[in-house]
Amino acid sequence: MQSAVDLGGRPIHFIGVGGIGMSALAHILLKRQLPISGSDARANHITQKLESQGAQIFSRQEATNIKQLCQGSSAPPQVICSTAIHEDNPEYQAAVQAGCPIFHRSDVLAALMQEFPQSIAIAGTHGKTTTSSLVGYLLLQASLDPTIIVGGEVAAWGGNARTGESPYLVAEADESDGSLVKFFPHIGVITNIELDHPDHYTSLDQVVSIFQEFVDHCHTLIVSVDCPTIADRFLALATDQSMITYSLSSKVSADYTVQNIDYSGQGTIVEVLERGESLGQLELPLLGEHNLSNALAAVAVGRYVGLEFPAIAKALRTFSGAKRRFEIYGEAQGICLIDDYAHHPSEIQVTLASAKLQAQAAAATYSQSRVVAVFQPHRYSRAATFFQEFSQSFQDADLVVVTDIYSAGEANPGTINGKKLADAIAANHSVVTFQPTLTNVIDFLQGHLQSGDVVLFLGAGDLNRIIPDLLTHFQVSSKPSPEVVLK
């Protein structure tokens, strides 16, 4: 792949344009009136939106697409790929044969980042999308007119990207494939660092190495010292002037801390401290320590760019969240259905803790409220690498439903499956059931859910596509069945 993408007017073609990361870049470039095309094997609302904005969309990934784009053109289009696109892809092969410049999606984001003097890159193993959305929303509410690129859809700007006219860019910076090292932001935020993406990394040291290089590229760093890896390995890498820290404990030496945390109702109320001095009260329509930490990162960014705390608090009070990040899809007959992207053991634990708070609030209305976790494991490599950790991640669930593994394109090694994972979880949990297919899951939930249940759909695959049918079922059916005890 080549290294210098041209954003000055040459046509650009995205292979796999329907993906959340690729489509955000396509949206930004379309707003610049660049000739944009893309292909995706599965049409979705994202590709339809891009097409309505002027992009040429191919519904199949075929070599003829590249040939068509090259016809009558003085120069072949630049071709953008994500890590999910392999060299055996017919469009990729045709692009090579046609002499098209080929770039990774991170090359486009890196080029965009260099155009914004106040670029803000949000990195970290967990919490990137929510934190990016919070920071973007904060700057938007403060009339700073940011350009925003996130890995989720946000109602406030109607999608996963927004084009602004100011020097501010807020971008989610992905570490999953090592491309994090290409970014040189003015402000770098690191929420936490853990081993994940075992298809790319084999050790935490490899992950740390990528983040260390990213740190060297940041003018100013904002980091959570609640993360042991950051506290142990990163605090000595920057001077006090270039590193800003935050923590959920007022007893920790950090620039931004909190105290008097109150998880009440459907949100969080907390007092925010800046270098030991109270800034005031922050109210969030979000639950859970992880979301509070994400919001504190946004506070730190806001203060760094010169916002007064009352303006920050006013903005964050109305943040409505991002899709698939503890997204309350709907409620029927007292059953609350929540969609969440969590697919790593640590993410599952903190998300279930939030669901437990939600269930405690529901218990005021219903005689009993349970947390029901429906988990679709994502990738064989992740299930195998974190097998033991997954088995111990569901303690806050009253009922656990496990499906077969969503491969995400990985070959089945034949050594790991959803049933083995369900059995391992059952060794540490009293009520676990394995329902291999999504149809099985629908049938099971229709017969076992009851009023007061908080149902959390966990995973980065396609589990969430069953939620609309379940919601419709409970909206039109009679009262839910009483609990059936699993044996």
From Swiss-Prot:
Pathway of action: Cell wall biogenesis; peptidoglycan biosynthesis
Record's GO cellular component terms: cytoplasm
EC number(s) from the headed UniProt entry: 6.3.2.8
SUPFAM superfamilies documented for this protein: MurCD N-terminal domain, MurD-like peptide ligases, catalytic domain, MurD-like peptide ligases, peptide-binding domain
Gene3D superfamilies reported in the protein's UniProt record: Mur ligase, C-terminal domain, Mur-like, catalytic domain, NAD(P)-binding Rossmann-like Domain
Family membership: Belongs to the MurCDEF family.
HAMAP family: MurC
NCBIfam families with a match to the protein in the record: murC
Protein's name in the database: UDP-N-acetylmuramate--L-alanine ligase
Taxonomic source organism: Acaryochloris marina (strain MBIC 11017)
Encoding gene, per UniProt annotation: murC
